[in-house]
A protein has these predicted regions:
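Disulfide-stabilized, aromatic/cysteine-rich ligand-recognition loop
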Residues: 231-235, 252, 344-400
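Cytochrome P450 core scaffold surrounding the K-helix E-X-X-R motif
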Residues: 204, 325-339
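Polybasic, proline/glycine-rich intrinsically disordered low-complexity segments
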Residues: 109-163
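Short, low-complexity N-terminal tether/leader segments at secretion or assembly junctions of large
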Residues: 1-24, 130-132
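Elongated alpha-helical scaffolds
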Residues: 84-105
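Acidic glycine-/aspartate-rich tracts in secreted/extracellular proteins
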Residues: 96-101, 197-200, 327-330, 367, ...
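Short aromatic-cysteine micro-motif
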Residues: 145, 152-315
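Glycine-rich, flexible loop motifs
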Residues: 21-86
């Protein structure tokens, strides 16, 4: 049960003839996973038996192979420090320390501290955050502390949440989102979603400086403790779609959004326990569970939304800001088909039955919608050119 190193001109067989050769290989659909993902006792990972990966050291090709499942503690394998930081993405590397192969975990997405591109190879990653406890049968149904699906004994299912390495955030070279956007979870074999409502990584600007027109510049992210971008920054559905496409992402359809949000508790009128939904709220707040609304840091005492998480570990599906989807419909409340000048200056026109005849669905609810917020909540009364201060989004992409 160990990593082994093969090297051109050193071992009996050259890398070119080693059976596993070919960039990387593994047995099955993945090679990196969380240990006992439904027990929640340990934050350890397993590198599966049969994994192999190539590395070019600037002179010759080398290959690492794994014989036997290799269990490791990411915190003990950090390049810096010995504790995993909450709300962060980590990357797993195979690195060469002299002639000894080892596993190194880092916040760096390029290569770990103490190594470079010729002595390390990124093979996967994970996110540290909140985790909803779910059934052990592979169906990912929320459970109470006795293991009953949607149960109310002990710790009721809505409150049965913990923290650690999010099991369905673990990715590798075989099992990964098409775009390594960061802050993502796997929803099913075909779909990955951002954990958080998207926020600004780079400020968004528009054609002619006019909100809602074509995006000139900007970049979004999925990150803990940030304010989600909305119409406050000038964005409508078209803009979210443009920004997503530029970064290799896309908007969710309504049915996909429901899959992401499944297992999120319904919002409440009188509290922010299950989402930023209290009817006295007056504005959006920062992303994430147990978040300090002022600093964006995790606050286990006064942080809001401690249980605002879905079965697949997406946060804020109920409340905070409505989330644009790509699903549209037609509004036939009036049927005077004509060219409608609604798309913005220099954007063309829309031939519709009325000036609001192309609704785009938004989901989840907003910051003061209370019990109207939930994992199927949908609003079909808004159109994609609408710039609204309480409309944000969540991004997705297909599996590689």
């Amino acid at each position: 049960m160990a990593l082994k190193l093969w090297q051109d001109g050193v071992d009996i067989a050259s890398v070119a003839t080693i059976p596993e050769n070919g960039n990387f290989k593994c047995v099955g659909d993945y090679f990196l996973k969380k240990k006992d993902p439904f027990l929640y006792d340990e934050d350890k990972l397993i590198l599966k038996d049969g994994f192999a990966v190539d590395l070019y050291d600037s002179v010759a090709w080398k290959q690492f192979t794994n014989r036997g499942d290799l269990e490791f503690d990411p915190a003990a394998n950090l390049d810096t420090g010995d504790t995993l930081a909450f709300g962060k993405d980590y990357f797993v590397f195979i690195a060469l320390n002299g002639t000894t192969p080892e596993i190194v975990v880092s916040l760096n997405s390029t290569y770990p501290d103490g190594f470079d591109e010729y002595s390390s190879r990124k093979i996967g990653g994970f996110h540290v955050g909140h985790i909803r406890k779910v059934s052990t049968d592979g169906l990912w149904v929320p459970v109470d502390s006795t293991g009953a699906k949607f149960g109310t004994s002990g710790t009721k299912w809505q409150d049965n949440v913990t923290t650690g390495i999010i099991p369905n955030s673990v990715w590798d070279l075989k099992n990964r989102p098409r775009t390594l956007f960061g802050g993502m979870v796997k929803i099913n074999k075909n779909l990955w979603s951002t954990i958080y409502q998207v926020s600004a990584d780079e400020a968004v600007t528009f054609m002619n400086g006019t909100n809602g027109l074509s995006v000139a510049e900007g970049k979004l992210q999925s990150k803990y403790g940030e304010l989600p971008v909305t119409g406050t920054e000038g964005l409508n559905q078209y803009n979210f779609n443009e920004l997503a496409q530029r970064q290799g992402m896309r908007l969710l359809s309504y049915d996909e959004w429901c899959a992401v949000a499944f297992g999120s508790p319904q919002g409440e009128d009188g509290s922010n326990n299950y989402g930023w939904t209290k009817t006295t709220n007056t504005a959006r707040t920062r992303t994430g569970c147990q978040v300090n609304t002022s600093t964006g840091e995790r606050d286990t005492v006064g942080g809001v939304k401690p249980y605002a998480i879905s079965a697949k570990n997406a946060v804020d599906c109920a409340g905070n800001v409505w989330e644009w989807t790509k699903t549209m419909s037609l509004d036939f409340s009036s049927t005077n088909w004509a060219w409608q000048n609604v798309l913005g200056a220099n954007q063309g026109q829309a031939y519709l039955p009325n000036s609001a005849g192309l609704p785009a669905l938004v989901c989840g609810g907003s910051w003061s919608n209370g019990v109207d917020c939930g994992p199927r909540t949908v609003n079909g009364n808004d159109y994609p050119w609408n710039v609204s201060t309480n409309f944000g989004s969540r991004f997705a992409c297909d599996s590689l």
